[in-house]
Amino acid sequence: MIKQYWTKQRIWLLIFLMVVGIGALLFTSHNEQFYQQPIAKVISKKTMSKQRVKDQFDNVDHQYNQQLQVKLMNGKYRGQKLTVQNTYSDSQPMDQRYRVGNEVFLTQLRKQGGKLTANVNGYKRDTVIVFLLWLVVLMLLLLMGRSGMFAFLSVVINALLFIIAIEIDLKQNGQHIMLLFSVLAIIFTFISLLLVLGFSKRMLATFAATVIGTFVALGVSMLVFMWTHERGIYYESMEYVTQVPRPLFLAETLLGSLGAVMDESSDIIATLFELKQLNPAVTRKQLFISGRNVGKSIMGPLINVLFLIFMVDTFTGSLLYIKNGNSWGYTYAMNMSLGTIQSLISGIGIVLSVPLVSLFGALLLGKKVQR
């Protein structure tokens, strides 16, 4: 079994990926000269002071003043050393603690009176990001082979399309954001399924169920919004929004629920396809019932996972609200309600996609009963 898995092609692929990974890590560890922003390496640190702070809500924290000696890694002052100050706290909400060996970005680097001065502006993280990306590609290609390659390719293409869509939205100042991201959702679905499943009946059934289930769920939610006059929905709680928040929230919900619906539809279709392979004479009714039963099994866990994903995004903000004397009700309304609404809309899409994908799968894969 092990010999069958580790073929000559896989061994050469592993060697190639290891060489690429080591090369990429070495490059990102020594690429400071390609950055315009000054980069320095911490060569020594010293804690100068420690202060206990307390706010009006009796929250206690400690602030530290670090004195860092750093060595410049790029620019016209490369190789020179300077001393910078850094203030951080135990909670580290908006600050960071630096250690010897860290590479950091500097701002406001200048020479005054023959002495260099600057401010610290965060870690240089490209090595960590490249390592994680390489690890994902390594596992995809080694464990999934060609399917993993196409899955990664679909992610890259979708990411590029997403960036293009954001640029278009910024140029239009959000005037057609729902139309833009609705078209993008359809393209996302088509490209992802085409690359992963290929152009087949499985792909068509999954595509139809995903698109219909997602948009029907969004349509149902918009009807509910209209009937309730959107009472209890606090769009003003969305952070850093420079456009009209309502369509932006709906576009965000559309893309968020799309992945879950596509995941469920793909699982059901894969099961129906296996049943068809095992029993070519299986009828459409049998496939429909089987698909519905599979959907019932995975529907609950998938909704819960989606709910947790939406909620965990608000966890730290909720703690901050409560620690600053706000009630649970106000914290939920201003920090968690939109995530709950997104979870409910996605749940509607997940529920609707079960009969839809079972129906499409049965029609395309099943055998018509002869009368």
How would you label these PLM feature ranges?
Residues 1-39:
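Hydrophobic secretory-pathway targeting helix
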Residues 39-99:
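Membrane-cytosol interface segments
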Residues 90-127:
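Extended, hydrophilic extramembrane loops/domains of integral membrane proteins
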Residues 134-138, 146-256:
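Transmembrane alpha-helical segments that form the functional core of multipass membrane systems
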Residues 200, 275-285:
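Juxtamembrane helix-boundary/capping and inter-helix hinge elements in multi-pass membrane proteins
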Residues 257-275:
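Short helical (or helix-break) motifs at transmembrane helix termini and adjacent helical loops
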Residues 282-303:
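Membrane-interface alpha-helices at helix entry/exit sites of multi-pass transporters
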Residues 293, 297-300, 308-371:
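Hydrophobic alpha-helical transmembrane segments of membrane transport and translocation systems
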